Amino acid sequence: MLFAILCDDKPDSLQLRLDTRADHLAFLHGLGDGLKFAGPFLGPDDKPCGSLVVIEADSLEAAKATAAKDPYALAGL
């Protein structure tokens, strides 16, 4: 089953996003074939302000568990 994970960054958190980006990308790469699509949302200033991640998982609970392990989530972004 496919699940879309929609993430809105907290206000004024661009630097946290940039500092955590390499770990986030490594995490996504580690999902292998389970990752179907991922990309940032851009604000009116063309700077990232959130993310969309589409993954394949066996259940909603499994998808939530995967989302909770994302470095962006762990950093409180």
Q: Residues of each region from the PLM?
A:
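Conserved, structured core segments of small domains
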Residues: 1-77
